[in-house]
A protein has these predicted regions:
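Extended hydrophobic/aromatic segments used for targeting, binding, or gating
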Residues: 179, 194-198, 350, 368-369
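Extended substrate/RNA-proximal surfaces in nucleic-acid metabolism proteins
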Residues: 58-186
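Short, flexible loop segments at the rims of nucleotide/cofactor-binding pockets, characterized by
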Residues: 22-27, 129-133, 187-191
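Active-site environment of divalent metal-dependent phosphoester hydrolases
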Residues: 13-15, 49-58, 95, 160-164, ...
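Hydrophobic faces of well-ordered beta-strands that scaffold small-molecule active sites
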Residues: 6-10, 47-48, 86-90, 153-155, ...
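C-terminal functional module detector
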Residues: 1-4, 15, 54-56, 63-67, ...
Length: 394
């Protein structure tokens, strides 16, 4: 068995032919640059590109296959220059009868299966070239379609206040999905504003593995959350086994941001912008008295929880708080570039490179910042209302 760093939720901004795929997303994010960034800079060994429903993205992937840069693996997924495995995914929006919208991810093994899925979904999605579009279907129906295509189905950023399963659609999985279809869900993506400790307070989620992914819309965001997975090889089939914890394949560890860094962790007044915990405010802003509140993930999970804090299934992987390197005070772009060029990828810097080497190349302040990442000593200023939290070094 081998261990790999994996980020299964990365977006393409624009195709090489100049067509926008995901708006708003950096135009620097093409299929090719995602793979190059993962390989040369990030050290992420498995990437999920979740815009492969788009024919423009399929065209770019096919071009790389024709060039010999991507090679189809025997278990599905494509190997890029023998260093990064590409898993094809599709983020799709659904809508419940009451108006709540949800984003979900469907992963498939190769271009042929993704093209088949895309052709079917084009009957529901008006512009199949753009990613994350509304399929004008309820969550249950998309689960059924994905299951018919043998896709790995994952609810995305499951608790965020906008366009997520528990954030805007339902109070329970059972209310939108019959028991017979529960096994069609391969895993649940936590999102940047939640962690394992929070999600495990909801008992019906104990049957599922959790994914911590970046949902990257720009190159520097790749790997801001990631997973360490145990696989025989970095193929689609092996990932499918790990998602379901079968045959000794598994998610070994989740590396996610402290939820307080997420931009939807706390409540936010939609009128004055105050970020605050719910407390006993009854939905009224304690600052301006406004009654329109964006409910944060922390409060939402508190509403759904049926278990006390600190309870977990015995097989739940460890969750490690990770600070994305661009968020570290005193670690500017030029300093990080120098560290990567001289000492290795970001994964190597975070997990392997001695602090003495970091200090030698970038100075004492940078070494202190990396020390804070590794031992969790940084102070966090909570985010909310669409604004990320901040890291404060002692």
């Amino acid at each position: 068995m081998n261990q790999y760093y994996a980020d299964f939720h990365i977006h393409v901004g624009i195709s090489e032919s100049g067509h926008w795929v995901k708006i708003p997303t950096s135009r620097r994010l093409t299929v090719r640059t995602i793979l190059e960034t993962a390989l040369r800079r990030k050290g992420i060994e498995i990437v999920g590109i979740v815009d492969a429903l788009s024919p423009w993205v399929q065209e770019d992937i096919q071009r790389l296959v024709n060039e010999g840069g991507l090679v189809l693996q025997s278990g599905g997924g494509y190997l890029y220059h023998n260093g990064v495995s590409l898993i094809l995914g599709a983020e799709i929006e659904t809508c419940e009868e009451g108006g709540g919208m949800c984003h979900s991810l469907s992963y498939l093994p190769d271009l042929d299966s993704m093209r088949d899925f895309s052709r079917e979904m084009s009957g529901y999605i008006r512009n199949i070239g753009l990613s994350s579009q509304n399929a004008h279907l309820p969550f249950r129906r998309l689960v059924e379609i994905a299951a018919a295509h043998e896709a790995l189905f994952v609810p995305a950023h499951a608790f965020t206040p906008h366009k997520s399963l528990f954030g805007s659609c339902t109070d329970s999985l059972a209310a939108v999905l019959p028991t017979a279809l529960r096994s069609s869900i391969a895993a649940v993506e936590l999102g940047l504003s939640a962690d394992t400790a929070m999600a495990d307070r909801i008992s019906e989620l104990w049957d599922f593995e959790y994914l911590t992914n970046s949902d990257a819309h720009s190159p520097d965001k790749i790997g801001r959350e990631y997973n360490r997975v145990m696989l025989e090889s970095p193929s689609f089939t092996e990932c499918a086994l790990a998602f379901r914890r079968r045959q000794d394949r598994c998610i070994v560890e989740n590396y996610g941001m402290d939820p307080r860094l997420g931009k939807y962790h706390n409540n936010c007044c939609d009128h004055c912008g105050l970020v605050y915990n719910g407390g006993d405010t009854a939905g009224i802003c304690p600052e301006c008295g406004g009654a329109k509140m964006v409910k944060g993930v922390s409060e939402r999970i508190g509403e759904l929880a049926d278990l006390p804090p600190g309870t977990h299934p015995s097989t739940r992987p460890a969750y490690h708080y990770h600070v994305p390197l661009p968020m570290l005070p005193g670690l500017g772009g030029k300093t990080l570039e120098k560290l990567v060029n001289e000492l290795g990828t970001e994964m190597q810097l975070i997990h392997q490179v001695p602090l003495t080497e970091i200090q030698r190349v970038a100075g004492t302040r940078a070494a202190r910042a990396f020390s804070a990442v590794r031992n969790g000593s940084a102070t966090v200023q909570s985010g909310g209302g669409g604004i990320y939290g901040r890291i404060l070094l002692d």
